[in-house]
């Protein structure tokens, strides 16, 4: 079966932004104009098509990335039919992981900003993630009908706060209540969308006389940006002082794909103005799968290999999301990078080293499914019923194995204890937590060794609220929830050598394991590093792995207060063994003993998660807010001017001091200040706090 749409006409894009920038509303309008939904769903009515979980519709935020396939031929039907695969991503900071795994598989992104709030903290996080994966992007400044909306101010913030190079290809006509439409700077025409048919039709008009000078100034900026794409365009521009519409588009496209510029558009999705032009810009300026860098991976021997977006290359795909569907079970969302795969084919999961049979393959429209017989390079689809696939796994051809680069997931910073209310809930809770953990790599489940409690950890209070809520709704599990606890960690600051000797000899076969370890800090964020420097066989090869396992087990149990130990390098340099009595378990225990004794003598410290906090407050309350953050052991890092006489405070504050902050901030500022926070890093706890934590744990 051949392709319906040539791959050059594919666009795999993400729509991402800060909470409340109007991202889901923008996606709803895209679905409406591309003919996929006949009635527009509003977020504030709880009817948005892309927000299909009950919690999303209740809270009016997007939690999971819904994937949708649509088709577009242009506002004037000026293009052949293009296939647009859209991923709508959450904007709340607790769900940053969803954004990360979406950007990993996209070719381009539309970043939505609010016309009045401009660049907000989560926008910076999303922008950094897009930089990391080198995703070409464009900007849609939404909510131009809101009080305080200012397109060019937001463009300036994108330049100063994000370090990007924005090039407006439109200007707004009027703002706030007076917002009427946009000027297309490439055509130098005003676009007026009809309010009678929800913006399905439009007319081109002359640029308003009072905006002619401003439009010409920004058009010159646009043409110069296009001319810088290559020498040919620059020569023509210098000779003639102008470029044709096609040349402008070609130059802007080339520079966007090279991540040199970011094109900026504006509008109001809610008022049905501007989204239509965004769709045209997606086709004109964002890349097809063949225009982005080939994906790199490793073969079985660890050699680097590439896969291109080509149906003739061997099949390779990345599983970027696992979702539990109430009717069909597990859905594995995958991005196909190369080759073709049909339903019924057997593929290889190269990370887990297992074969998987692809039963049914479906293309998603939010939470509606359409079954397809095959998927090809460039496609985003979901497979039903895969057994052992988790997020970040590679699926590939049985005879051409490849591991695409793994995604890195953040360490959870907050945990709560959950207890089932009845014995019946006990069994269901285990199943529910297992499924939810498979869906979300930033959510972990563990059992406390001392109390036997089940602990769940995640990226924030909202994250864990939603997990508990989903257990109740989707799996009918009732549970009691404890107070949030901070996920402390331990590490060492010094270097030491230590001996671990485990001997049990009481008639018959005994146990004997003896090791010497050098214990020192590893590089920050390097995790656990184990080095084997045994020469001459003082510890036989078959026991080396057991020593490493013993060290790792002790690291998980901690040495000071029972918290997992981070960033340690352990070097096994000597030891001895017994021909008969030595065993793996003996060396495992010896490794564990050596690590515990050594770590206690290597200046162990407790680490706590530090949060990057941004508080937006009216100037009158500034002193109160700063004083309160100082009381919470916060370090003020800087201050910026926000919109409408607001100040934006940036600070680093320990997570343990931030519980209940929302309520305190509201009462201190009469509800006029707001804040956001995200994990920054683990930092050493002051001595007095460390002593208190150790006392509470022992």
Curated annotation (Swiss-Prot):
Residue limits of the tr-type G domain? 8-290
UniProt keyword annotations, A-Z: Cytoplasm, Elongation factor, GTP-binding, Nucleotide-binding, Protein biosynthesis
- Spell out the family assignment given in the record's similarity comment: Belongs to the TRAFAC class translation factor GTPase superfamily. Classic translation factor GTPase family. EF-G/EF-2 subfamily.
| Cystine crosslinks | none
Localization of this protein: Cytoplasm
Originating species: Photobacterium profundum (strain SS9)
- Which InterPro entries does the protein's record reference? EFG_II, EFG_III, EFG_III/V, EFG_IV, EFG_V, EFG_V-like, EFTu-like_2, G_TR_CS
GO CC annotations? cytoplasm
What's this chain's function? Catalyzes the GTP-dependent ribosomal translocation step during translation elongation. During this step, the ribosome changes from the pre-translocational (PRE) to the post-translocational (POST) state as the newly formed A-site-bound peptidyl-tRNA and P-site-bound deacylated tRNA move to the P and E sites, respectively. Catalyzes the coordinated movement of the two tRNA molecules, the mRNA and conformational changes in the ribosome.
- Protein name (record): Elongation factor G 1
GO terms for biological process, alphabetical: ribosome disassembly
Question: Where GTP is bound, by residue?
Answer: 17-24, 88-92, 142-145
**Does the UniProt entry include the keyword GTP-binding?**
yes
NCBIfam families per record: EF-G (TIGR00484), PRK12740.1-5 (NF009381), small_GTP (TIGR00231)
Q: Name one GO molecular function term.
A: GTP binding
GTP-binding: is it a keyword of this entry? yes
């Amino acid at each position: 079966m051949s392709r319906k749409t040539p791959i050059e006409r594919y666009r795999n894009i993400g729509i991402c932004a800060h909470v409340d920038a109007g991202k889901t509303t923008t996606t709803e309008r895209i679905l409406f104009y591309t003919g996929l939904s006949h009635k527009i769903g509003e977020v504030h009515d709880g009817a948005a098509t892309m927000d299909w979980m009950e919690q999303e519709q209740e809270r009016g935020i997007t939690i999971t990335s819904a994937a949708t396939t649509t088709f577009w031929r242009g506002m004037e039907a000026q293009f052949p039919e293009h296939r647009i695969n859209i991923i709508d991503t959450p904007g709340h900071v607790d769900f940053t992981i969803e954004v990360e795994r979406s950007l990993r598989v996209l070719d381009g992104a539309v970043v939505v900003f609010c016309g009045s709030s401009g660049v907000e903290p989560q926008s910076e996080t999303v922008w950094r993630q897009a930089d990391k994966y080198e995703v070409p992007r464009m900007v849609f400044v939404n909510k131009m009908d809101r009080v305080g909306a200012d397109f060019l101010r937001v463009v300036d913030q994108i330049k100063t706060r994000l370090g990007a190079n924005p090039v407006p290809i439109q200007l707004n006509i009027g703002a706030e209540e007076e917002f009427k439409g946009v000027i297309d700077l490439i055509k130098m025409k005003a676009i007026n969308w009809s309010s009678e048919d929800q913006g399905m039709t439009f007319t081109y008009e002359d640029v308003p006389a009072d905006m002619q000078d401003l439009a010409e100034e920004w058009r010159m900026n646009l043409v110069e940006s296009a001319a810088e794409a290559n020498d040919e365009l620059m020569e023509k521009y210098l000779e003639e002082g102008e470029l044709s519409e096609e040349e402008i588009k070609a130059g802007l496209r080339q520079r966007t794909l090279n991540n040199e510029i970011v094109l900026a558009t504006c509008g109001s999705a809610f008022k049905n103005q501007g989204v239509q032009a965004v769709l045209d810009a997606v086709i004109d300026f964002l890349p097809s799968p063949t225009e982005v860098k080939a994906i790199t991976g490793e073969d079985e021997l660890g050699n680097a290999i590439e896969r291109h977006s080509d149906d003739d290359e061997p099949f390779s795909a990345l599983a970027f999301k696992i979702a539990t569907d109430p009717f069909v079970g597990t859905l594995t969302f995958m991005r196909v990078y190369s080759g073709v795969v049909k339903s019924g084919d057997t593929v290889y999961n190269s990370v887990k080293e297992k074969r998987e049979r692809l039963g049914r393959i479906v293309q998603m429209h939010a939470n509606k499914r359409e079954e397809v017989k095959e998927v090809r390079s460039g496609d985003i689809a979901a497979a039903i019923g895969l057994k052992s696939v988790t997020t970040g796994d590679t699926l590939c051809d049985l005879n051409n194995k490849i591991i695409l680069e793994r995604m890195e997931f953040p360490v959870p910073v907050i945990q709560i204890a959950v207890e089932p209310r009845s014995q019946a809930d006990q069994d269901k809770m285990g199943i529910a937590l297992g499924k939810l953990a498979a869906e979300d790599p930033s959510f972990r489940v563990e059992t406390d060794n001392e109390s036997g409690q089940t602990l769940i950890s995640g990226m924030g209070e909202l994250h864990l609220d939603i997990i508990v809520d989903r257990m109740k709704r989707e799996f009918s599990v009732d549970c009691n929830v404890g107070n949030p606890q901070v996920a402390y960690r331990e590490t060492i600051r010094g270097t030491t050598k230590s001996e671990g000797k485990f001997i049990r000899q009481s008639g018959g076969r005994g146990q004997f394991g003896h090791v010497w370890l050098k214990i020192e800090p590893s590089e920050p964020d390097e995790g656990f590093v184990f080095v084997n420097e045994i020469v001459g066989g003082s510890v036989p090869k078959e026991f080396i792995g057991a020593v490493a396992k013993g060290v790792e087990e002790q690291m998980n149990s901690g040495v000071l207060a029972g918290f997992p130990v981070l960033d340690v390098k352990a070097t096994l340099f000597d030891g001895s063994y017994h021909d008969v009595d030595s065993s793996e378990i003996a060396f495992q225990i010896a490794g564990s003993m050596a690590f515990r004794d050594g770590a206690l003598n290597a200046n162990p410290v407790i680490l706590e998660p530090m949060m990057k906090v941004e508080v937006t407050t009216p100037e009158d309350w500034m002193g109160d807010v700063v004083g309160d953050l100082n009381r919470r052991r916060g370090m003020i890092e800087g201050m910026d001017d926000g919109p409408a006489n607001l100040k934006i405070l940036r600070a680093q504050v320990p997570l343990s001091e931030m519980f209940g902050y929302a309520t305190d901030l509201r009462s201190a500022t009469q509800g006029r200040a707001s804040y956001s926070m995200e994990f920054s890093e683990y930092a050493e706890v002051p001595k007095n706090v460390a002593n208190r934590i150790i006392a509470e744990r022992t």
